[in-house]
A protein has these predicted regions:
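Long, low-complexity, charged/polar intrinsically disordered regions in eukaryotic proteins
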Residues: 1-5
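Nucleic acid-binding interface residues in structured DNA/RNA-binding domains
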Residues: 6-23, 28-124
Length: 124
């Protein structure tokens, strides 16, 4: 989820490095049509310290998804899911999906469609 003027508290260089680490981890999972949990993703980010339930992680994922979608690669963060329970992305993903023009009237359908789009792009 993106927030205007959000202060993440890191230098821009460190933030960008963390974003790239997260992006690469998600791409690796998408290439094999896989997914990654929020807690496993934050372990892959070493340039900055984030926790799985950190609002800064939400913003980082929002930036990545917006950039990837603008590049016609879909919302890459669709591969990041809860470890337990519904095994789907959190509510911030769907809020951003709506702002990017996705139909979220059926969350499961929205998620599956976006997951297929991202997997198809990266696995080819």
């Amino acid at each position: 989820m993106l927030r205007e003027g959000f202060d993440h508290g890191f230098s821009q260089a460190d933030w960008d490095a963390g974003k790239e680490e997260a992006r690469k981890a998600m791409i690796e999972r998408a290439k094999v049509r896989g997914m990654i949990t929020y807690s496993d993703l934050v372990k892959q980010i070493t340039s900055i310290h984030l926790e799985a339930h950190d609002s800064r992680l939400d913003h980082l994922l929002g930036e990545i998804s917006s950039e990837e979608d603008a590049a016609d690669r879909g919302m890459l963060t669709v591969v990041v899911v809860h470890k337990v329970g519904d095994m789907q992305p959190g509510p911030g993903f769907f809020e951003l999906a709506l702002s990017l023009g996705r139909d979220i009237s059926n969350l499961l359908e929205c998620w599956v469609e976006e997951l297929r789009r991202v997997h198809a792009y990266w696995s080819n």
